[in-house]
Amino acid sequence: MQVDFYYYSYQCPLNYNMLRLLSECKDIELNTYDIAQKPELAEKMQMYFPTLTIINGNTRRYSPITAGFIEELKAGRVPKERPFCPKNGTKPAQGRLVSIGANNIEKACLCCGSPCAESAVCKAKFLKLHGEESFGYMLLDGKKALLGGAEYLPSLSVPYSVPKDEETAFITCCYLTDEEYDCKSAPLSALERSLAEKYSRVTVISDEKGVFPNGNMEFSLLHGYQDEGIVYEDENYCRLHLMSKQI
C-alpha cells in the first residue's frame, strides 16, 4: 500500500500526530510533502485542507488519519470517506473571548480532540514564523474549557491557491460544531473586528455541506461572506467555494 501525505506544516496540530502515526507503520510505502513553502505543489494537488492523503496514487482522502485508518490500510483495505456534516446549533454559546497566542496555543489545540503537548509546541513555532502576536480568538466557558475558536494567517503566507495581497487575511480554521449551540460565531466576529485594524478583506474556503475545517458555506453566508465561486470539487466528498468579506 502506497501513501502520499501532503500537509501544511503544523498549521493543524493534528499534522504532528498524523506524521507520527504514519512514520511508525513499516508496512506502508510512505512519501511526505510539506507544502508550506511550495504553493505550486498545493495548486497542482488542488489542496485547500490542512492535509491531503493520496492512497495508491489515485484515491484522495481529506479527513485526519487515525490509528484505525492505518490498520485498515495494513489489511489491504481503503476505508470509504464521508464528509463531516453535523447539525449546526444556532443558540449562541456564552463564554469569555480570549486572544490566541503562543502562550496559550495548547488550549486552542484541544479543538482537535486529545491534548498533545508536542503538537502544540510545533504549532506555536509554526505561527511564530509569521511574526503575529495573535492568531485568532477562542471562546472559553466559566471553567476555562474550550468552546470554539477562529484562526487566521496573512493571505501572503498561505500556500493555497487563493487571492493574496497585504490587505487580505485568510481564515485557516473555525471550530467547534455543536448540535445545539453556536460556538463559532463569537470568536469569528471577534477575529474580524481585530483584523479590520490591519486588513480590508478576509477570505475563507467553505464546503457547501461539510463543516471541516471552517464551517460550511451556509455559515459563511450568514456572516456576510460573498461567494466568489467554486475552487475545487470532488463528487465523493466536497464542493469548495472561495468566500470573501470586506471588513
Task: Cite the ranges covered by each PLM segment.
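Local sequence-structure signature of Cys/Sec-based thiol-disulfide redox active-site neighborhoods
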Residues: 1-26
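A short helix-loop-beta-strand connector motif used in the catalytic cores of GNAT acetyltransferases and
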Residues: 45-48, 126-138, 148, 170
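Non-catalytic, surface beta->alpha helical segment in thiol-disulfide oxidoreductase systems
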Residues: 56-84
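Conserved beta-strand in the GNAT
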Residues: 138, 144-158, 170, 175
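A short, internal acetyl-CoA/4′-phosphopantetheine-binding micro-motif in the GNAT/acyltransferase core
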Residues: 172-183, 208-209
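Conserved acetyl-CoA-binding loop-helix of GNAT-fold acetyltransferases
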Residues: 180-196
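Conserved GNAT acetyl-CoA-binding A-motif
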Residues: 195-211
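Conserved active-site alpha-helix within GNAT-family acetyltransferase domains
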Residues: 209-229
